[in-house]
């Protein structure tokens, strides 16, 4: 399967919980999962990957670098996009952040049993829908309840 190409899409909020405005330090697309800027710049976000700082929420609109972007946070119900490499999700699955900027991935239930995989990052929330696979380079989209959890890490 070809790699995912992040695209802007309407996150179509069903419910907005906490919403805050941040500065995009690089281009952020509508619907992308965003995280703190890695350098610790105050109130600044970038598209999240499993290698960035903790996930904050989902961008409600596209913003160029230096522009303000509204971010749906805890308690919000919005659509996210899964990475095409990560396939599908079932309602009730925990969704984390993929290696693809701004995309989600199903969190393996074994993580709760202290899986020894590094770079697991935050869970962004819980899938409310079964999310079908996308087509070609665009992942499937579906609703999640944003419920940020702390980073899951391996325990020795």
What are these regions (language model features)?
Residues 2-156:
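Glycine-anchored, exposed beta-strand/edge motif detector
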């Amino acid at each position: 399967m070809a790699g995912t190409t992040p695209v802007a899409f309407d996150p179509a909020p069903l419910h907005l919980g906490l919403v805050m405005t941040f500065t995009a330090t690089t281009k952020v697309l509508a619907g992308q999962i965003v995280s703190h800027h890695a350098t610790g710049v105050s109130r600044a976000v970038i598209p999240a990957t499993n290698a960035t700082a903790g996930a904050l929420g989902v961008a409600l609109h596209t913003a160029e670098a230096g522009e303000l972007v509204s971010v749906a946070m805890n308690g919000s119900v919005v659509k996210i996009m899964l990475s095409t490499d990560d396939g599908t999700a079932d309602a009730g699955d925990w969704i984390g952040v993929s290696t693809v900027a701004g995309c989600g991935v199903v969190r393996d239930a074994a993580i709760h049993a202290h899986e020894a995989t590094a770079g697991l990052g935050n869970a962004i929330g819980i899938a409310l829908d079964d999310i079908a696979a996308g087509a070609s380079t665009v992942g499937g989209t579906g609703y999640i309840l944003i419920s940020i959890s702390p980073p899951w890490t391996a325990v020795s």
